[in-house]
């Protein structure tokens, strides 16, 4: 009987702790505070910029809506063990420090990595849309 009660208590404790795992939320700057978003491929000198207010708002909103939390952690300034990535830099209007996230594909899945904050899986549509920016002149 004592073993049974111990097993039940342990099981309930495990379930409670498992349910308390928080989902990290990707926190991007507010679109009103951004003057420009720059997009640059890792090994390229080619930098594309987005400076239209509605495009900035739309991109930030889409990334936030379509990002799913993962258990992966970001422990470096830039993604590691990734062949190629896109640097997405948010230039703030009234602040010296800019925000940056990285978009990359790993094992046929697309991720956004925010240095030291976390890694989120994103919908392939977002990745494709950002990739298309490099195919057209803005």
Per-segment meaning from a language model:
Residues 21-23:
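Bacterial signal peptide processing site
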Residues 1-5:
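Positively charged n-region of N-terminal signal peptides that target proteins for export
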Residues 16-19:
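C-terminal motif of bacterial Sec signal peptides marking the signal peptidase cleavage site
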Residues 114-138:
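C-terminal partner/receptor-binding element of secreted or periplasmic proteins
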Residues 69-109:
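Short, structured surface segments that line ligand/substrate-binding pockets
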Residues 29-45:
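Post-signal peptide N-terminal segment of mature Sec-exported envelope proteins
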Residues 40-74:
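Post-signal-peptide N-terminal segment of Sec-exported extracytoplasmic proteins
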